[in-house]
Curated annotation (Swiss-Prot):
It comes from Methylobacter tundripaludum (strain ATCC BAA-1195 / DSM 17260 / SV96). The record marks N113, L147 as: Important for acyl-CoA specificity. Keywords: Acyltransferase, Amino-acid biosynthesis, Cytoplasm, Methionine biosynthesis, Transferase. This is Homoserine O-succinyltransferase. Its EC number is 2.3.1.46. It is an enzyme of class 2 (transferase). GO terms for cellular component: cytoplasm. The keyword 4Fe-4S does not apply. The record marks S196 as: Important for substrate specificity. The gene is metAS.
Length: 354
């Protein structure tokens, strides 16, 4: 399902340069196939704003190569933005009002940074709730990533997330708990997913409220679950959209925070991510960081060039398969008219007929 470059968003050109298939509007208009319209509510902070676009666009673009995808990025109020990020949003993003007017077949909601212990205290909570309220009635299926999962579960079912003793950070093995669900058809029964979060919603809480858990890790808990109807909301607690080096960038950021005295302890390694060679490189670098901090010297450059060849990606293929299943089912269920969520005869309370 190739992406259509229906705007001048720089992400399209960046993906072209990486080898992704991107259709121009003229070519797309000559294909007599009902396109799909997918919203991306991007709530990530400025440093990750465009990377998040690319990550989710890649997963969408890697799906079935027949249907065309129009991805519509938008954001909400209540998120702190630099002038540069705000300019990017103003130039390339659509407004929520426009999204509502035109309609969507599917909606992806990213994670976000928080500054309060409870989600309803965040400035973005009310605008996000308005998106939830509209999408639940007007979109065939919503896919939530990490914090968006926690927010929508609290909004819909009243379940508050629990603060973990330590950050769940790294790459963890998961196992399917229901191999028959169409969302996980023909994917690996065991697969890895990156996690990066301080909070969790537990399997027991999800199942108590009727959510169907599809993939679990002994170490990291639930990654994949769906709403009681089986499809209308898909919940990720992990980050299957992450690039190879997303966790590396987070680790580098935490080292800088330590050097600047923004955190007291030196950051631990993300679990199951760095091999022995990388760990030794980073142990040596830690000594230089500590020395520079103590003496007030300038910090040496992070040894990224020595590390990149040792970083393995063990999650993207499964992520692409899940996205392919998700969007394929949406295509089968959604109405021919863009503003309506289901074709005639589909039960919204059991769209998959399970």
């Amino acid at each position: 399902m190739p992406l259509v470059a229906h705007t001048d968003l720089p992400t399209f050109q960046r993906l072209r340069e990486e080898g992704e298939e991107i259709l121009d509007p003229d070519r797309a208009s000559n294909q007599d196939i009902r396109e799909m319209h997918i919203g991306l509510l991007n709530m990530m902070p400025d440093a990750a704003l465009e990377a998040t676009e690319r990550q989710f666009f890649r997963l969408v673009g890697a799906c079935n190569q027949i249907v065309q995808f129009h991805v519509h990025p938008f954001t909400i109020e209540g998120l702190k933005r630099s002038p540069e990020a705000q300019a990017h949003i103003a130039k390339y993003y659509e407004s929520f009002e426009q999204i509502k007017r035109d309609g969507l077949d599917a909606l992806i909601i990213s994670g976000a940074n928080v500054s309060h212990p409870r989600l309803p205290e965040e400035d973005f909570w009310q605008p996000l709730s308005e998106v939830f309220f509209w999408a639940k009635e007007n979109v065939t299926s919503i896919l939530c990533s990490c914090l968006a999962t926690h927010a929508l579960i609290q909004y819909c079912y009243g379940i508050e997330r629990t603060r973990l003793p330590a950050k769940r950070w790294g790459v963890f093995s998961h196992k399917l708990t229901d191999r028959t669900h169409p969302l996980v058809a023909e994917i690996n029964t065991r697969f890895d997913v990156p996690h990066s979060r301080f909070n969790e919603i537990f399997q027991s809480d999800m199942e108590r409220h009727g959510l169907k858990v599809l993939a679990v890790s002994k170490e990291a808990g639930v990654h994949l679950a769906v709403s009681p109807d089986g499809f209308r909301i898909v919940f990720f607690q992990g980050h299957p959209e992450y690039d190879d080096i997303s966790l590396l960038k987070e680790y580098k950021r935490e080292i800088l925070r330590f050097y600047r005295a923004e955190r007291d302890d030196y950051p631990p390694f993300p679990e199951n991510y760095f091999n022995d060679v990388v760990q030794q490189i980073l142990v040596d670098y830690e000594q230089r960081v500590r020395s520079a901090k103590q003496s007030g010297q300038r910090l040496e450059e992070f040894p990224e060039s020595l590390i990149l060849e040792h970083i393995d990606n063990t999650w993207s293929d499964t992520a692409k398969a899940v996205f392919n299943n998700w969007l394929g089912k949406i295509y089968q269920l959604t109405h021919q008219e863009r503003g309506l969520p289901f074709m005639d005869g589909v039960d919204p309370n059991n769209p998959l007929g399970l």
